């Protein structure tokens, strides 16, 4: 069962060939400008692995006229987009970014951690844009254990956490390293159900057509995109199955 697929309503029967044609036509749209492609996709996954190519370059090469590897990062400061976590890490439209914030992280920071964050935030606001080295030099936070069991600069880890919580935004990159600026906050979406439906629609725009199981898993991944609404995911998934078209493909 694919959800959604083609223009058929719920549980229509379609052939595998028809689904393939639809999938190709839907995702490989006519090459356009970089801003329009990002707006259409809503989200572009980022991955630093360069073999065979980085994920963002593989995605955009066939969807942007005259695209060259690295164009996204080079033009990022002027594109009006953000680096952020959606169902995984990547580049998101400003509209999607606003939907996910203000974000309440599941990992609760103690008062001492927040005090450090506010000191760094004041420093960033004073400087405008900062490289992690500048923060480390200013505050000398030392080292911390990273996700892989190794050692990382504690300042870098703090900046990552501040970025995820919406205190900072990525202003640009220098040699692949994120440089940060302060991010101005805004009010939370007044209608949680509508906001969750909009997040689900970004998943559909990016990944459909796809099997119901895969679709359901991606909706559950919204726990990282909007942890403050993690309890609203099941209801959003149920609404999506009611409002989005689906199909049985070759009897499956």
Each model region followed by its residue ranges:
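Long, low-complexity intrinsically disordered regions
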Residues: 6-252
